Amino acid sequence: MLKDQNLDIERKQDHIEINLTQNVESTLKSGFESIHFIHNALPELNYDSINTTTTFLGKSLQAPILISSMTGGTTRARDINYRLAQVAQKAGIAMGLGSMRVLLTEPDTIKTFAVRHIAPDIPLLANIGAVQLNYGVTPKECQYLVDAIKADALILHLNVLQELTQPEGNRNWEKLLPKIREVVHYLSIPVIVKEVGYGLSKKVAESLIDAGVKVLDIAGSGGTSWSQVEAYRATNSLQNRIASSFINWGIPTLDSLKMVREVSKDIPIITSGGLKSGIDGAKAIRIGANIFGLAGQFLKAADTSESLLFEEIQLIIEQLKITMLCTGSRTLKDLAKAEIRL
């Protein structure tokens, strides 16, 4: 057990370091570069009237932005999560925590995840890999993770390709959907299912919605490639070559968003995966997202300072607001109907 615990911590340290120092982007594009808003030269709007507010999980957001799940479990991760939480609270946006599996075996790591005292008002998301349900994690333990950080929802992340290219990855993905359904019905709060950078297909979205999942985070291709992250962690050339061969794998984020929105007009969708700016976020809202998530650039900023992170989030919000004004969109509902060309 101790060996497994140490491996969890080591893996989390590796993931932070690799994401900060190596190029681990997918060679696929997110797809949003193919969408262009029709510029409105006479918007008849006052910038001060632009309204980016929305609601998510019953809470108000000042902008439709999620700091996507990144890390936890280590001292460096604690510092990063504290900065993320401080800035999320200040900016009025949502935040996801990194995988909390380590908390089930290392209770002391709670201090690296517990940020509710820093961010009392924002939607806060607990997180664990869905495949862990095939390796002994129970619905009761999922509720424990939620309670431990006073979360508003639980993310069950789907990372099959990452696990299969990871030296110590889990390989049994059989009969997982019934276990997801069981967690959905057991928990006192909503379950979000999230991909980690390869997208959700129409078929998978249909299955998850049927299982009672309340929110989908499509996390398509175009951003971080976790198989490429694992290529840097490989302990031999064969593992490296296997992982590296999947750098262009997945469903581009735009395609995944269209697929999932076709399945349901109503389910809340978080769009992440390769979004680089508030302009990309605006495009995601236009195509059908409720909120949009970013991770990589926030991680780099948060590893440096709270002020740099806040500037990065201000940049995203300002880009979003300018896009709204230049499309004649006073609200996010207006933005969802803005003119575009493909």
Swiss-Prot record:
Listed EC numbers = 5.3.3.2
Q: Name one molecular function that GO assigns to this entry.
A: FMN binding
One GO location term (cellular component): cytoplasm
Q: Which InterPro entries match?
A: Aldolase_TIM, FMN-dep_DH, IPdP_isomerase
Task: Name the principal localization, coarsely classed.
Answer: cytoplasm
Q: Which Gene3D superfamilies match?
A: Aldolase class I
Gene Ontology biological process terms in this record? isoprenoid biosynthetic process
**Which residues are FMN-binding?**
68-71, 99, 127, 194, 224, 274-276, 295-296
Among its keywords, does the record have Nucleotidyltransferase? Answer: no
What's in the keyword line of the UniProt record?
Cytoplasm, Flavoprotein, FMN, Isomerase, Isoprene biosynthesis, Magnesium, Metal-binding, NADP
Which annotated residues bind Mg(2+)?
163
Q: Which cofactor does it need?
A: FMN; NADPH; Mg(2+)
Coiled coil feature spans: none
Q: What is the main EC category here?
A: isomerase
Instruction: Specify the superkingdom.
Output: Bacteria
Q: Give the reactions, separated by semicolons, that this protein catalyses.
A: isopentenyl diphosphate = dimethylallyl diphosphate
Q: Where does substrate bind?
A: 11-12, 99-101, 162
The answer to keyword NADP applying to this record is: yes
Q: Mind telling me which NCBIfam families this protein's record contains?
A: IPP_isom_2
What the record says about family reads: Belongs to the IPP isomerase type 2 family.
Question: What role is this protein assigned?
Answer: Involved in the biosynthesis of isoprenoids. Catalyzes the 1,3-allylic rearrangement of the homoallylic substrate isopentenyl (IPP) to its allylic isomer, dimethylallyl diphosphate (DMAPP).
- Known partners and oligomeric status: Homooctamer. Dimer of tetramers.
User: Can you say what this protein is called?
Assistant: Isopentenyl-diphosphate delta-isomerase
Q: What is the name of the gene encoding this protein?
A: fni
